[in-house]
């Protein structure tokens, strides 16, 4: 906890910022993902994994704590964790994905959010 004195001489305790990024490994099922807005060109899984590794490296470079999940490996779109929850300082709002194939992803994200201390609605 860091204490700062304001210009009026009042001290405030500010908890240190915890920067957490939740990521999910690209699942083997990625090829079957929801892609209604782009064509169905084949996905190069080697390239997808390389791009994901570079993304994780960038997050670590900016000092994010990276939590890597593999709970949704059977969900083709499980890699897109940002679609399942909006996370604020102390609260996460769980999404209700529109595509039936994505609805099962939320439970895995909810469990991880509990592990890192984020209440959710």
Please tell me what each predicted stretch does.
Residues 2-120:
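The feature marks the mature, well-folded catalytic cores of soluble enzymes
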